[in-house]
Every structure is written in structure tokens, then in C-alpha cells.
Amino acid sequence: MASETDYGTYQNVTEDKKYLGQEGLYLPMGGETCPPDGVSPADCSKAQEEMRNLRWSYLNSDYYKGVNDRWIAQGCMDKIKREMGYRFVLTSGGYTTNVTPGHLLKVVLRVKNEGYAAPFNPRAVELVLRNVSDQTTYVLPLDVDPRKWKPDMESTIEIEAGLPTDMPIGDYDIYLNLPDPMETLRDNPDYSIQLANEGVWEAETGYNSLLMRINVTSDEKTDIYNGDLVFTKK
């Protein structure tokens, strides 16, 4: 975007960009702008197309201000900031509404990545049930890798798990938690991934509300669960 070869970044522009676009699906990719040399300054449309194709996760905000300020003036810088890196949106979901302790809970979630890239570091994923009355919380770690939630793609998470046999009767809200996998950061909500949907983020916990509520009931509404995936009390 700064010159024919982006100041020597590329030799074969078409092939090199194709290669970097694939690498950027798995590795950190980004950079900075430069004073245009022999080409017209990149406008918003061109800039966003290039960053998405190259899977950018970061942009130097200090250089080159002549180009960065142009994007601000054209009104796309906020959108660039939102879509830089990954941007996960919950598009739909379904779940078992009434479940008996010790029985099967089914949840299906669909998440779209509207960002330029995917996460390049490992990330934990948990399904959380929290009692509406006393806030008692149950957690289920999921065998899901958000690094595989690629840009412009929708991913499906299918969960079949059991409730503890001693789980108290009552209503429970369902949350999705994507904490940092490091033990020292796992319970720090500042390091949890926030979904882009409005009205779902819980800042004090780092949980994302799925806007779903199940009723744990003594009535046998679902099949008995005999598998290994069982929620545990936090």
C-alpha cells in the first residue's frame, strides 16, 4: 500500500501476499504504514481489503500518521480497530431447557469470526452454569480450539454433557468463558475474550452470557448421562 513492493517487503507481490495470507491464519501478522512512494495513498476500502487478506492482528498507531489520519478522516479507523485480529460473534444457539441432575444436557452454539485473523495463542473454552438464586457456579471445560475459528467462517460447537447427580434444583444461566490458559491469568477477566455481541459481556467475571437459561428439575426430562463430560462445581 506504500509502494509497488511496499518498500521492499515483496519480490513477487502476488505470490508473496498469497503466502503471507496463509501464514497469517496461524502466526501474528501486522505492521505499519509508510509515506506513499509512486502509488496513491491507500483509502479505507483498499486498506481494509489488504488487512483482511493478509490476516493482520496489529497496526502501529504512531507511524505513519499521514496515512493513519487519512483513515480516521475517511471514517474507517474505528472499524479497522474492531476487526483487527479476531472478532467472535455468537450467531445462534440451542439447548435443552429442562434437565434432571445426573442427566444429559445438550447445547449447540454457532460462532462467526468477523475479524481479520484468528487467535495465535492457545485459549481455554468453558461452558458455565450459574444458579440464578445463589450464584453457585458449575464449569465444563470444552475440547475446543478457538485458533481454528478462522476469519469469515462460522464454527459450530456441539456439547453433550452430564449434570452432577447432586446439583441443586433451580434455574441456571448459561455462559461461555474463554479465559487465558495460564493459571496466573485464568481468573483475571481482563484476559478473557469478549464476544462482539451487545449485552452479553460480564466484566466482573469475564463471562459471556449466552442469554439462555435452563431449569434443573426433579422431573426426568432427559436421558441419564453415562459419559465422562460432567460439570464440576467451581
Residue ranges of model-derived segments:
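A short linear-motif detector with a strong N-terminal bias
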Residues: 37-39, 66-71, 106-108
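Extracellular/luminal regions of secreted and cell-surface proteins that mediate adhesion/ECM remodeling
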Residues: 78-234
